[in-house]
Amino acid sequence: MYKFVLSILLVATMGIFAGCTKYKDQKKAVSGFAKVYCDESFKNILEQEISIFEYQYPHSNVMARYMSESAALDSLLNKNVDLIITQKDLTQDQKRYLASKNRAYRSRMIAVDAVALIVNKNSDIDELSMQELTDLMTGKYRTWGKIVPTKLRNDSVKLLFDGNASGVIHYMKEKFLKGKDFSFPVYSAKSTEEVFQLVEKNRNAIGFVGVSWIADDMGESAKSNEERFKQLNKSEQETEPTAIDFTSRVKVLKVRSMDRVQGVKPYQAYIADGSYPLFRKIYAIDAAYPGSPSHQFFVFLTGVIGQKIILQTGVMPGAEPVRIVDVSN
């Protein structure tokens, strides 16, 4: 088994920590109520970001709403919210629309996420190729036995997604169906947690979830906000590496690219070098006024600590370089 140990390489800059007095003043300056709309598949990460942000800046409060990607984008354009997290950057038409309304915006890739394939932990299926996935997604074959050698032979394949308008299902449709709808019924769960529950109960099911939902952070979640903040705030020389394994609730499948003889699981190293083929970029899009609470949270997400939090969830940070160390057991 392989565990990948990653740590962020931070460029030391003068004046970051200028003293306790300045830091206390900064804590008071960053205050107020921020609002962010986000795709459900990124919820696990955003909740951790909010928890540390509110600990660091106790006079701040962030309200997150989780919805479909299209609903979040519409809300930004209609000025119902000024900060969203989505897997798509703004189109040229959307940029022109914001400009016509005199709304300045900032867009930053904050992460490279991956879509993980999960099956019942007692399943004898370990790997799917991109061609086999294509056959599943297009409905060419509807029973497991026609896809891979398995004891499930005549069992129908049950595809499970975290909602019919989520970023995950949009990504898979664009990847395999050129954006078209499925030609057969698929199951849209009410949440990512329900996808896990259904996979645990149904041996013929295969679920599609954001990779942060399968990551076992090796004890990070058990730490208090104070402990996590102290660790996140360490200099490069003191930064502890992050060891990521996967949850034992389900089996995480390997995925094999067309040009490879062996599949890989969505470890950060394989996401980073492109070996794991089901990866997607995640963007934070901020149209808030500079200095406003929503903009301050955007700055946090794209800064050093925000990127370290992303690293600890099994996802690749988008704004900071990382060092990857392969540790074999």
Q: Model segments located where?
A:
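Bacterial N-terminal signal peptides
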Residues: S7-I16
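Pocket-flanking alpha-helical
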Residues: S70-K101, I214-D217
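A short, gly/pro- and small-residue-rich
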Residues: R96-Y105, V112, K223-S235
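Short, solvent-exposed loop/turn segments at the edges of secondary structure
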Residues: I110-D113, L278-R280
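Exported/periplasmic ABC-transporter solute-binding proteins
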Residues: C20-P58, V62-S70, D74-L77, V119-N329
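Acidic, polar ligand-binding/catalytic clefts
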Residues: I85-R108, A243, V250-K251, S257-Q262, ...
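Positively charged n-region of N-terminal signal peptides that target proteins for export
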Residues: M1-F4
